[in-house]
């Protein structure tokens, strides 16, 4: 008995000491700032330090006399076991500092191909991060060699091990050629979770410095640095003792930049050796590179790429799937022809030109257009496509949807050729800076049809008149600091495209300025502070696209009557009070955006009716309310005009009352590919969502509303502060003969008296395909009540958001039978003051597989739930849970983890939980 107990105690002590070491390491790595939180973790460590010597003393004393352990000794053994279990829980289930989503953010873009040289450079970079005497690391090499790819891979590798890597925070900032101190500081501040007023802008560096000092150890990655940066001015406190474990990694094309920034280590990213270059080339070309006929030529083509990864990837993808020997020989000849007289940096332009030459003619111009935007700029794809159509690069005869589909296809082909890449947000693209440099070089060096002036994002204060020549076809001066536009520019300019958006200091467009551009097809003045446009604007007879987004002082425009070729008109968030005069004469106009025009009050009757080509009418968030027969305002357009537009595909409008929107408009709704309808008498209401069929009803009595016909087309329904919801739902339950299968999202805000008439319960699931459900201030004790109320089975539900439901005691209980939440992925619950638990499936049969109750639930976020005692009973196993955030839930006693979970809990929850469970 003694030997057995002694061995058990010895094993338990060894395990506990191992866990103690891991916790100490985690505490050291985490960089925890709040002393109270740090003290609570040390509670566990102190108990370990108290009990380990006691256990060792027992073993020492008992080894000399073979007697059984006393009851007191057995208590020590049990205490050691408990401490070991608690420690294991801390290591496995609690992210000691922050969730991985906070410590490291994923940087989008390709990782490098896993080759020996690349992996060695990555290992070398990681080794530098571990060296105590190394704070600043330079990564340098020519453009296109893979510097950004290397540090991006480092960043994303750190994300994989965010909870255990050495830094409290990893910050990624793209600097770019046109360095802007304030912009870089704002990017860092955003990563730190800081927002600033204009008055605080002058203190950005100081505020960043103070926050970084608190972090103790951080990693700052500065990508694409062209000129030395004063880190002290930026707000980076590397010189302080408290930040001695912090690091800065920068990438640059020039070693001189790294040296002037006093880097401790510099890593050169060189071109690939022949063998690895061939491997990367084959990876991108595919099997055709090793075919008998092609391989000898392919070897030579690979050699001509000079080991430069960007060239290898670009050329490789251009030739992918092309087995014709003639194509390969032609490619090789083109590469060799440019080789003798140009250096390596220009060599990449030769390889990129080869990829460019393989493009179809319209794709070439579309590709070059992308270079008009500033470096590292994320271009919205839909806006890019409209530019292309307006300039005549894409067929403008297609319907709007077909036009967008063609444009997206072209974008994807350019991405497949490595000439474009994904932008920083959804549905955006951008150019690699080397590819953009090539495009600008090509446009500035070519003759008729290509000549462009690109000075976007250069910080220009004065208009560069000396750069203008009559042959320039595209001009991009966007995102500068121009203070004024000249009254006179060189005469006879052939410019088709003039992009001036983002010059917020410009207050006026002189009359003579636009006279210099009689052939304009595209004019973009978004974000300038103009109140109107000059009379000469009316002479732009070739204009096809006029973009005046975010011109918040723009009150009116000259008559548009003479702009007979205009196709796209964008006045988003302008201050116009009525639609421009002469609009009714524009028979070619196919796109109007007046969204978020909060002062728009007038659309004269008959104006819209004349726009026979109109396909998109976007008035989301506009103050104008469309009337229907019987409620129209005198002299104002009504919805009946819209129904007469034969080509309309997208419609976003606001109407006063849903009751008058009857089945007679069903034919209109059916032929729309996308719509956003808002019904509200209130002038300023947020527009509905951005899905295919969005319906929002706000501050309306809907007790007599019969909208079943409309819900057949709706994908997203938002009900805000509506009276009579019980009556509307009763109508749906009693009159609906089929489910609303299109509905994917339902949001209800303020429904304090939810109740149906006796016996009025739906026998079918009204929303069988619902994926998102949001409830705010709804009178429910359990979400399960919706089962009987609307027949909602929630079998497709992925996201559930609940807030302010004061009667809610549990989310799901036996009213939702086991197995009906197979797709639920995320739950967010806020300010439900009576909520006691999330799940209670106590009546589920004992032999039922617990793991199948919520098989896909990965994220739970809980906030301000004072009565919440538990998340679930013992029957529920949250096998897939990955992320748990808990804030201000004082009564919560247990957490739903199982072996293998990697619980990512925010630090406030972690410490509150530890202080309760560890005593």
Curated annotation (Swiss-Prot):
GO terms for biological process: defense response. It comes from the Eukaryota. InterPro entries: Apaf_helical (IPR042197), Leu-rich_rpt_typical-subtyp (IPR003591), LRR_dom_sf (IPR032675), LRR_R13L4/SHOC2-like (IPR055414), NB-ARC (IPR002182), P-loop_NTPase (IPR027417), Plant_NBS-LRR (IPR050905), WH-like_DNA-bd_sf (IPR036388). GO terms for molecular function: ADP binding; ATP binding. Pfam families: LRR_14, LRR_RPS2, NB-ARC, WH_DRP. LRR repeats lie at residues 447-468, 469-492, 494-516, 519-540, 542-564, 565-587, 588-610, 611-635. The keyword Coiled coil applies. Residues 1-30, 74-95 form a coiled coil. Residues 121-399 form the NB-ARC domain. ATP binds at residues 141-148. The keyword Repeat applies. Keywords: ATP-binding, Coiled coil, Leucine-rich repeat, Nucleotide-binding, Plant defense, Repeat. Probable disease resistance protein. Belongs to the disease resistance NB-LRR family. PANTHER family: NB-ARC DOMAIN-CONTAINING PROTEIN, NB-ARC DOMAIN-CONTAINING PROTEIN-RELATED. The LRR repeats probably act as specificity determinant of pathogen recognition. This is Probable disease resistance protein At4g27220.
């Amino acid at each position: 008995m003694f030997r057995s107990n002694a061995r058990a105690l010895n094993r338990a002590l060894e395990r506990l000491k191992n866990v103690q070491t891991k916790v100490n390491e985690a505490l050291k790595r985490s960089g925890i700032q709040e002393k109270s939180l740090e003290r609570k973790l040390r509670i566990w460590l102190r108990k370990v330090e108290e009990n380990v010597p006691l256990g060792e003393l027992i073993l020492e004393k008992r080894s000399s006399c073979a007697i059984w352990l006393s009851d007191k000794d057995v208590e020590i053994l049990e205490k050691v076991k408990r401490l070991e279990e608690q420690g294991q829980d801390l290591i496995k289930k609690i992210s000691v500092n922050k969730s991985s989503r906070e410590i490291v953010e994923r940087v989008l873009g390709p990782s490098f191909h896993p080759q020996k040289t690349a992996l060695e450079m990555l290992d070398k970079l990681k080794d530098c991060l571990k060296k105590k005497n190394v704070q600043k690391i330079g990564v340098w090499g020519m453009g296109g060699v893979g510097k950004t790819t290397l540090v991006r891979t480092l960043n994303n590798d750190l994300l994989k091990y965010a909870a255990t890597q050495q830094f409290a925070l990893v910050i990624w900032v793209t600097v770019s050629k046109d360095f802007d101190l304030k912009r870089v500081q704002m990017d860092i501040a955003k990563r730190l979770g800081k927002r600033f007023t204009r008055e605080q802008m002058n203190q950005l560096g100081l505020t960043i410095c103070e926050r970084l000092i608190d972090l103790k150890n951080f990693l700052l990655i500065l990508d694409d640095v062209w000129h030395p940066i004063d880190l002290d001015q930026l707000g980076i406190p590397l010189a302080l003792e408290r930040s001695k474990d912090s690091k800065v990694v920068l990438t640059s094309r020039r070693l001189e930049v790294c040296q002037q920034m006093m880097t401790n280590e510099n890593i050169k990213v060189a071109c690939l050796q022949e063998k690895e270059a061939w491997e990367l080339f084959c990876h991108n070309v595919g099997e055709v590179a090793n075919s008998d006929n092609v391989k000898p030529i392919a070897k030579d083509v690979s050699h001509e790429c000079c080991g430069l990864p960007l060239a290898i990837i670009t050329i490789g993808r251009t030739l992918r799937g092309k087995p014709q020997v003639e194509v390969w020989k032609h490619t090789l000849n083109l590469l060799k022809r440019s080789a003798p007289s140009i250096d390596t940096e220009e060599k990449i332009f030769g390889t990129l030109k080869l990829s460019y030459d393989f493009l179809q003619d319209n794709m070439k111009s579309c590709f070059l257009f992308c270079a008009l935007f500033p470096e590292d700029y994320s271009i919205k794809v839909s806006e890019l496509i409209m530019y292309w159509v307006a300039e005549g690069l894409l067929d403008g005869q297609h319907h709007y949807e077909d036009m967008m589909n063609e444009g997206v296809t072209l974008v994807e082909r350019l991405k497949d050729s490595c000439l474009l890449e994904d932008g920083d947000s959804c549905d955006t693209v951008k150019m690699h800076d080397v590819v953009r440099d090539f495009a600008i070089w090509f446009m500035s060096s070519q003759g008729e049809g290509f000549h462009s002036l690109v000075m976007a994002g250069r910080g220009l204060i004065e208009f560069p008149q000396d750069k203008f020549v009559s042959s320039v076809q595209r001009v991009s001066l966007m995102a500068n600091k121009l203070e004024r536009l000249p009254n006179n520019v060189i005469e006879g300019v052939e410019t088709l495209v003039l992009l001036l958006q983002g010059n917020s200091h410009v207050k006026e467009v002189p009359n003579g300025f636009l006279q210099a551009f009689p052939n304009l097809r595209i004019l973009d003045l978004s974000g300038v502070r103009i109140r109107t446009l000059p009379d000469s604007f009316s002479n732009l007879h070739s204009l096809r696209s006029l973009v005046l987004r975010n011109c918040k002082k723009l009150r009116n425009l000259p008559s548009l009557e003479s702009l007979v070729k205009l196709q796209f008109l964008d006045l988003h968030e302008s201050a116009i009070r009525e639609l421009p005069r002469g609009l009714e004469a524009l028979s070619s106009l196919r796109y109007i955006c007046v969204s978020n025009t909060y002062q728009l009050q007038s659309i004269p009757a008959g104006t819209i009716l004349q726009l026979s080509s109109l396909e998109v009418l976007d008035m989301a968030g506009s103050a104008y309310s469309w009337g229907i027969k019987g409620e129209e305002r005198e002299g104002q357009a009504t919805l009946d005009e819209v129904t007469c537009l034969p080509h309309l595909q997208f419609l976003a409008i606001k109407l006063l009352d849903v009751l008058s929107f009857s089945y007679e408009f069903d034919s209109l709704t059916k032929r729309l590919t996308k719509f956003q309808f808002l019904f509200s008498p209130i002038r300023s209401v947020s527009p509905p969502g951005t899905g295919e069929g969005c319906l929002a009803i706000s501050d309306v009595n809907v007790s007599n509303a019969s909208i079943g016909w409309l819900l057949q087309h709706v994908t997203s329904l938002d009900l805000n502060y509506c009276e009579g919801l019980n009556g509307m739902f009763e109508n749906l339950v009693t009159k609906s003969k089929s489910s609303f299968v299109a509905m994917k999202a339902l949001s209800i805000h303020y429904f304090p008296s939810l109740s149906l008439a006796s016996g009025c319960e739906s026998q079918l699931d009204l929303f069988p395909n619902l994926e998102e459900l949001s409830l705010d201030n709804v009178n429910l004790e359990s979400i399960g009540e919706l089962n009987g109320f609307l027949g909602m089975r929630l079998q497709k539900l992925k996201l559930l958001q609940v807030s302010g439901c004061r009667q809610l005691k549990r989310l799901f209980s036996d009213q939702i039978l086991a197995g009906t939440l197979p797709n639920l992925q995320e739950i967010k619950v806020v300010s439900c003051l009576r909520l006691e638990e999330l799940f209670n499936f106590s009546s589920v049969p004992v032999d039922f597989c617990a793991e199948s109750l919520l098989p896909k639930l990965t994220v739970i976020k809980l906030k301000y739930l004072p009565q919440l005692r538990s998340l679930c009973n013992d029957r529920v196993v949250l096998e897939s849970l990955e992320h748990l955030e808990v804030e201000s839930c004082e009564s919560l006693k247990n957490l739903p983890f199982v072996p293998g979970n990697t619980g990512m809990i925010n630090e406030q929850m972690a410490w509150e939980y530890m202080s309760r469970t560890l005593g």
